[in-house]
Amino acid sequence: MQLKKKKFESKISLSKDARDGILSFCKMNHPNEGILILRGKAKRGNVFIDGLVVPPFSETGADFAGFPHNPLPLDPSYVGIVHSHPVGSAEPSLTDLNNFFGLVSMIVKSPYEDDDIFAWDSDGKEIPLVVV
């Protein structure tokens, strides 16, 4: 017997505190990229993000940001990552997609204002994002 996997429409809900923390972090790290782990809950395609974690041993530069995944504790509240693009668009690069972590990848483009945050799935498709 073959079971069909239900496909849910994804939606990302971001708390105002998390949004403000993301934007502040990106502004502080400019002109370098910044990277954070997103903390929250997921159910039936909906992801609610209410916390941020600075990844241990992260490295950033003008055109890269990353961290090794192996020293991370096993934490089911880690739902994805967010990083900044100081120059250019907020679309994920091939490198971004190849280093996908969790359920969602958010990218913030300069000048790091409320409308400069975008969410993507592992296929590079944009996911609707609302601030709550």
Q: What function would you assign to each model-found segment?
A:
Residues I81:
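Conserved, mostly hydrophobic/aromatic
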Residues M1-Y78, P86-V132:
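Conserved beta-strand-loop surface patch within small alpha/beta domains used
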